Amino acid sequence: MDSPSLEKDGFLLTTLDGLFGRAQSGSLWYLSFGLACCAVEMMHAAAARYDMDRFGWIPRATPRQADLMIVAGTLTNKMAPAMRKVYDQMSEPRYVLSMGSCANGGGYYHYSYAVVRGCDRIVPVDVYVPGCPPTAEALLYGLMQLQAKIRRDDTASRRELLDRSPNRQPN
């Protein structure tokens, strides 16, 4: 049988990578790395009005159970090694969402000697959510953009990028 006749009969034709991407994007377990005032907006998004749980986004207390880290707030030079350690403890595939001007590029404290000018200097970031602080709706939109990115992302190409990463430790 050809694929158009199967689709007419109610069958869905997809690849295994597409199926896994769809399942994974619908069940993001996130670790909140709240460093400043943006973390308050992150709490608003998880509360009853917006209810992130209905999208399948479940908070985790340990990085070993999480596949998404939401970095919210000002990242200082002293906190950067701890954030990298937490990121390294997350299982593959892992994603990072940078929330707010301070996490994106240093924000108000950009010229301070103690601030990292963007968390993307420490960990690879998949989605940036702008604002100071960004609203809960902006965070939800950013998470939906990450879901769409996971659905269309080719897992094989992502693995190849990880293998070519300069920070990659040899096995």
Curated annotation (Swiss-Prot):
Superkingdom as given in the UniProt entry:
Bacteria
Required cofactor(s): [4Fe-4S] cluster
List locations, semicolon-separated. Answer: Cell inner membrane
Q: Which GO terms describe its biological process?
A: aerobic respiration; electron transport coupled proton transport
Per the UniProt entry, the Enzyme Commission number(s) are 7.1.1.-
Topology within the bilayer: Peripheral membrane protein
* A single MF term (Gene Ontology): iron ion binding
Write out the entry's keywords from A to Z.
4Fe-4S, Cell inner membrane, Cell membrane, Iron, Iron-sulfur, Membrane, Metal-binding, NAD, Quinone, Translocase, Transport, Ubiquinone
The note on the cofactor says: Binds 1 [4Fe-4S] cluster.
Complexes and interactors? NDH-1 is composed of 14 different subunits. Subunits NuoB, C, D, E, F, and G constitute the peripheral sector of the complex.
This chain's function reads: NDH-1 shuttles electrons from NADH, via FMN and iron-sulfur (Fe-S) centers, to quinones in the respiratory chain. Couples the redox reaction to proton translocation (for every two electrons transferred, four hydrogen ions are translocated across the cytoplasmic membrane), and thus conserves the redox energy in a proton gradient.
| Identification of the protein by name | NADH-quinone oxidoreductase subunit B 2
The gene from which this protein is expressed is nuoB2
